[in-house]
């Protein structure tokens, strides 16, 4: 048997092909001919048998006596399997209005094949040597024709590691007609440079630059007379070096779509789509969307497209996702300081060497990021664990990963052994799907400073609940089993808060009547009552829930058989435990890196199951399971808090979702004593729960713990090895829409308080003053970032993803601005008025769009807040935003609104200072600067000449 590491499966012309890397690092192709899809047919009318309908269309029918729907495990005996002869037969049957429903018809052929054959979607397999063929159809070094996939191919779980892949990193540079306008595929907006870095694993094999003719190049640059020749050389480069993947940054958002457009202009699109290992097959152009971003790629045979931008966006929360910011964040290296206008000017003048170095450096940064983040290994291990393809990980959402694992567990090798059929329509109609339900339990904290707080949390709480309670689609029953019943009341007459709010409303009404009855001269009393009523109205509004709930729920789950979800989760958690144990005994750094990515993949995959169940739409929604899991989680945390107080004698400081923060022992207990008490408390409380539920000690003690409200606290932690670290949750440091100067101010004050510094007020005042002094901080410290959704680019009648608060107001304003018969002018005016009602960052994005600059939907834009003409925080915020790149070029003419930045940090810092006992220092500093600004405003108005 030959060992092959499969990195791609695909289906074409009733043949499954798997491309992989052999032990000698060559690419091989495994071909499985005549694999036919199998669907499962549900008989909806017992008086009519639809089997004859399928046999007449060429289907081969199999009896599946144990098959039933995954939802509720109902309908045993009403299903049969049918093997699809061809696409046309499947289409004809689907158009037949018969007494049947077809299920599992939307599952991809490769997912079905790997599930039935028990093969990994990405990973090591073994292929019989007798399957090697000499007459090949691909350019692979070796081809295997597998006539019997049941015996001639099998998984190879004993082989470890991920072989190095030959990857080419690339980046393109494009000319634009206007220096400040983003390229839009006009006739002369050509691709004039392509930077290439060819690597095998972490080893760089060669670095090249392909370019149109330039006047200052040396002999190492490959130059071509036309854009068509340049693109042909790029295609030939990928083919010649036999790569398994092309990689870049945002290549699915810009580079590949633009190359497709230029190839279409130069009549080379067919050649571009034949880059794969089978040059006779025309690859399919596909589009995908994650969040608000649209991605375009070509599904080449044996050549993957890896875009680092969506991968990093899904795995890391950063302030910005520009390549320059990401590279500086991870590898401490940035792009060359070249602006788009410099790129366009270089093409127009022919002096392109500097831009060429910039282009190549971008590709090198992508290579460094892949090496640093171990992206290739991470993608391979995650895809193998989730039973998906590599590209599905970042072109589709989380749900496909869970669906693939459930489908694999429900798919036997022999179709007659089928038990659970996954319905194409998702959830059955008799399963309750409410629009919202109560979330996790929260033990309300008392704000303050606490010492020696011990954090305890449930290990994999929701997966453990699903396993211990056997919560699954297939175990939900109407009668019998274990019942989970509860009520949810919020904002209704059964809610105690409702009675308090009602009483408060009555009191407000009485006060208003009393105030109306006061004599006119009682101005002071009326003012006091008005202030009191205003405070009570604010309190009344805060007590009003966003959603009114008045529900009674009851679900039953049987323990007669193990459900699919518990079995899948048990395998994931047990596999992760085995991998983590092996990491401790492995000395090989390469194997350790692979195992670490694998255990992380198991963890992420297990945690994704609960979120997938709780969706309204998707592959397998299961609100009953999600609600029951959440309910059990609430009961567990309540039980844990009760046990910690009664059995262990702990004091509960705070509890939330899956964590408890407690105090043990006496005030003078040493850290070693507290450590041992925490371990004993974990063992004692865990003994009261069903396995695998366990309350774990987090292996650290918070020597100082400052909590403000639920989900918002800061701490200083002590670990067993004597190290100390500070941390936080839910405060300004966690918010990406805060400027770095604000976060640095908060971090400095937080560290000073946690470390017990005597200079806390001085540090707060100094940090606040630094924000007001020009030159004291770096320009980057004032950058704000926010994500921008679709703003309806290019269409004045389309407002994208944003909702306009008052369209009637916008229509009225637009009508006043233009003549009644000017339809085009009205559309433009209406667009402008609508944009005024969008968030400030969307207004900035609209201005950038009108200037011809690219605004990627879903990306985070960097901007600064400009100073008002009088220096006071007045005027609409949307009109005072400017993107950071443009501001940096003209910052002398556009001073910053430093009061805005100072105000943004006042409330958060003062909450920290007041809770720690220092008083509202920051608000006093801000008030002084604000008063100074208003004095300056009055002076400017008096000194400004009148016209």
Curated annotation (Swiss-Prot):
Keyword Repressor carried by entry: no
MF GO annotations: 3'-5'-DNA exonuclease activity; DNA binding; DNA-directed DNA polymerase activity; nucleotide binding
EC number(s) stated in the UniProt entry for this protein: 2.7.7.7
GO biological process: base-excision repair, gap-filling; DNA replication proofreading; nucleotide-excision repair, DNA gap filling; viral DNA genome replication
Record family assignment: Belongs to the DNA polymerase type-B family.
Organism per entry: Red sea bream iridovirus
Catalytic activity: DNA(n) + a 2'-deoxyribonucleoside 5'-triphosphate = DNA(n+1) + diphosphate
Keyword annotations of the record: DNA replication, DNA-binding, DNA-directed DNA polymerase, Nucleotidyltransferase, Transferase, Viral DNA replication
Gene3D superfamilies: DNA polymerase family B, C-terminal domain, Helix hairpin bin, Palm domain of DNA polymerase, Ribonuclease H-like superfamily/Ribonuclease H
Keyword Transcription regulation: no
Name used for this protein in its record: DNA polymerase
């Amino acid at each position: 048997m030959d060992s092959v590491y499969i990195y791609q499966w695909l289906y074409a012309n009733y043949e499954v092909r798997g491309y992989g890397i052999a032990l000698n690092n060559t690419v091989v192709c495994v071909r499985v001919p005549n694999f036919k899809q199998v669907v499962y047919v549900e008989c909806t009318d017992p008086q009519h048998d639809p089997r004859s309908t399928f046999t007449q269309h060429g289907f081969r029918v199999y009896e599946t006596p144990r098959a039933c729907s995954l939802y509720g495990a109902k309908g045993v005996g009403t299903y049969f399997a049918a093997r699809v002869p061809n696409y046309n037969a499947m289409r004809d049957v689907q158009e037949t209005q018969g007494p049947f429903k077809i299920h599992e018809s939307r599952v991809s052929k490769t997912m079905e094949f790997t599930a039935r054959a028990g093969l990994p979607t990405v990973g090591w397999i073994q292929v019989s040597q007798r399957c090697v063929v000499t007459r090949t159809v691909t350019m692979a070094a070796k081809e295997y024709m597998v006539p019997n996939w049941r015996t001639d191919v099998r998984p190879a779980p004993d082989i470890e590691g991920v072989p190095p892949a030959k990857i080419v990193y690339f980046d393109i540079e494009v000319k634009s007609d206007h220096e400040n306008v983003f390229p839009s595929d006009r006739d002369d907006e050509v691709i004039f440079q392509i930077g290439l870095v060819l690597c095998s694993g972490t080893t760089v094999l060669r670095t090249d630059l392909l370019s149109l003719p330039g006047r200052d190049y040396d002999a190492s640059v490959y130059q071509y007379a036309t854009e068509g020749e340049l693109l042909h050389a790029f295609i030939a480069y990928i083919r010649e070096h036999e790569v398994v993947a092309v990689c870049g940054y945002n290549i699915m958002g810009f580079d590949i779509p633009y190359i497709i457009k230029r190839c279409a202009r130069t009549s080379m699109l067919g050649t571009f789509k034949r880059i794969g290992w089978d040059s006779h097959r025309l690859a399919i152009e596909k589009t995908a969307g994650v969040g608000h971003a649209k991605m375009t790629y070509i599904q080449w045979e044996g050549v993957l497209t890896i875009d680092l931008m969506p991968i990093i966006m899904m795995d890391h929360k950063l302030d910005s996702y520009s390549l320059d910011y990401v590279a500086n964040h991870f590898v401490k290296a940035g792009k060359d300081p070249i602006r788009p206008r410099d790129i366009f000017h270089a093409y127009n003048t022919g002096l392109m060497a500097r831009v060429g170095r910039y282009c190549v450096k971008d590709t090198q940064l992508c290579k460094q990021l892949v090496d640093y983040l171990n992206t290739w290994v991470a993608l391979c291990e995650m895809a193998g664990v989730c039973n998906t393809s590599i590209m599905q990980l970042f072109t589709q959402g989380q749900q496909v990963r869970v669906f693939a694992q459930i489908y694999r567990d429900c798919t036997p090798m022999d179709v007659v052994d089928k038990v659970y059929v996954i319905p194409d329509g998702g959830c059955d109609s008799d399963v309750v799907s409410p629009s919202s339900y109560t979330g996790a339990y929260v033990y309300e904290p008392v704000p303050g400073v606490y010492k020696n707080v011990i954090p305890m949390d449930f290990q994999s709480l929701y997966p453990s609940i699903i396993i211990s309670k056997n919560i699954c689609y297939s175990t939900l029953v109407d009668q019998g089993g274990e019942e989970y019943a509860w009520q949810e009341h919020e904002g209704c007459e059964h809610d105690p808060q409702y009675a308090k709010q009602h009483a408060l409303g009555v009191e407000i009404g009485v006060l208003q009547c009393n105030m109306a009855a006061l004599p006119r001269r009682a101005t002071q009393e009326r003012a006091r009552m008005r202030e009191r009523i205003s405070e009570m109205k604010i309190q009344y509004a805060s007590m009003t829930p966003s959603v009114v709930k008045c529900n009674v729920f009851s679900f039953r789950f049987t323990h007669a058989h193990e459900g699919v979800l518990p079995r899948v989760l048990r395998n994931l958690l047990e596999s992760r435990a085995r991998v983590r144990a092996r990491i401790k005994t492995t000395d090989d750094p390469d194997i350790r890196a692979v195992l670490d990515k694998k255990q992380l993949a198991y963890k992420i995959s297990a945690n994704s199951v609960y979120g997938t169940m709780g969706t309204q739409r998707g592959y397998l929604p299961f609100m009953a399971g999600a609600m029951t899991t959440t309910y059990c989680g609430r009961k567990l945390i309540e039980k844990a808090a009760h046990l910690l107080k009664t059995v262990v004698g702990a004091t509960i400081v705070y509890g939330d979702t899956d964590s408890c923060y407690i105090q043990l022992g006496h005030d003078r207990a040493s850290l070693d004593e507290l450590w041992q008490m925490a371990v004993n408390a974990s063992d004692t409380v865990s003994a009261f729960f069903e396995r695998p539920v366990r309350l774990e000690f987090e292996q650290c003690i918070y020597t100082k713990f400052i909590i403000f409200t639920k989900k918002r606290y800061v701490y200083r932690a002590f670990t067993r090895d004597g190290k100390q670290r500070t941390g936080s949750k839910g405060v300004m440091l966690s918010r990406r829409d805060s400027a770095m100067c604000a976060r640095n101010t908060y971090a400095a004050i937080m560290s000073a308080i946690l470390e017990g510094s005597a200079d806390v007020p001085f540090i707060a005042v100094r940090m606040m003053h630094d924000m007001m002094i020009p030159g004291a901080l770096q320009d980057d410290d004032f950058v704000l970032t926010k994500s921008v959704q679709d703003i309806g680019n290019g269409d004045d009648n389309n407002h994208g993803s944003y909702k306009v608060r008052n369209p009637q107001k916008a229509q009225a304003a637009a009508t006043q601005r233009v003549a009644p018969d000017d339809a085009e002018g009205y559309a433009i005016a209406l667009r402008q008025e609508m944009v005024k009602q969008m968030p400030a960052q969307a207004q900035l994005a609209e201005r950038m769009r009108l200037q011809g600059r690219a605004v990627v939907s879903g990306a985070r834009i960097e901007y600064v807040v400009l100073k008002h003409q009088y220096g006071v925080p007045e005027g609409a915020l949307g009109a005072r935003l400017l993107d950071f790149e443009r501001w940096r070029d003209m910052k002398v003419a556009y001073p910053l609104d430093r009061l805005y930045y100072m105000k943004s940090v006042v409330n958060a810092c003062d909450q920290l200072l007041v809770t720690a006992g220092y008083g509202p220092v920051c608000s006093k500093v801000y008030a002084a600067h604000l008063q100074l600004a208003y004095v300056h405003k009055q002076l400017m108005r008096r000194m400004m000449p009148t016209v």
